[in-house]
């Protein structure tokens, strides 16, 4: 995995303040702090990652998609760009949807086979698309890369996976 230069003061202060504002539930102030980071660091993966959270927190999915694309271009070796792009595509009011999210995330799995959230999200998308056999396969792949009881508990609260809930219960990983 590629190494990215660390942010340095004063940009670290703005970055920390942005994270603080997000923690307080104020994405607008977080965005203002990110905007204060010097131009040469605006494309830093950490800055883009937090900027995506700001956009998502404001339900600005077109902007979130643009930021995810920038992150993917800047740091294709990080799973966050792939995940953010598919998440934004799923929620995009026009030109997006579950199938677009599925198609965008599917190529990420071979690059990040140990990243549990990728097969988990693919299982969710497959369920929503009515591809239950594929959903089962993706969910089992996710189980292999994570704490199975924790993942099953999370899945049993995830409406996207509702068609698989009876099977997830039967896995014996979680007490009903």
Annotate each predicted stretch with a short phrase.
Residues 7-46, 50-57:
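Alpha-helical segment of the N-proximal tetratricopeptide repeat
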Residues 6, 40, 74, 111-112, ...:
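Structural marker of alpha-solenoid helical repeat scaffolds
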Residues 49-61, 66-117:
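Alpha-helical adaptor scaffolds
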Residues 76, 127-128, 132-150, 176:
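TPR/TPR-like (Sel1-like) alpha-helical repeat modules
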Residues 1-4, 149-176:
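Terminal, low-structured helical/coil segments at or just beyond the last alpha-helical repeat
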Residues 19, 53, 87, 124-125:
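Residue-level recognition of tetratricopeptide repeat
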């Amino acid at each position: 995995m590629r190494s990215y230069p660390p942010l340095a003061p004063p940009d670290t202060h703005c970055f920390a303040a942005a994270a603080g504002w997000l923690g307080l539930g104020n994405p607008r102030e977080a965005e203002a702090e990110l905007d204060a980071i010097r131009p040469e660091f605006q494309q830093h993966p950490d800055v883009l990652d937090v900027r995506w959270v700001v956009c998502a927190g404001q339900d600005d999915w077109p902007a979130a998609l643009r930021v995810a694309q920038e992150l993917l271009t800047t740091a294709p070796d990080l799973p966050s760009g792939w995940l953010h792009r598919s998440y934004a595509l799923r929620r995009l009011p026009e030109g997006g949807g579950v199938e677009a999210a599925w198609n965008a995330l599917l190529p990420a799995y071979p690059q990040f086979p140990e990243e549990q959230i990728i097969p988990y999200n693919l299982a969710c998308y497959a369920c929503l698309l009515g591809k239950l056999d594929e959903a089962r396969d993706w969910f089992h792949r996710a189980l292999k890369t994570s704490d199975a009881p924790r993942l099953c508990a999370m899945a049993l609260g995830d409406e996207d996976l509702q068609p698989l809930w009876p099977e997830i219960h039967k896995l014996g990983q979680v007490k009903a």
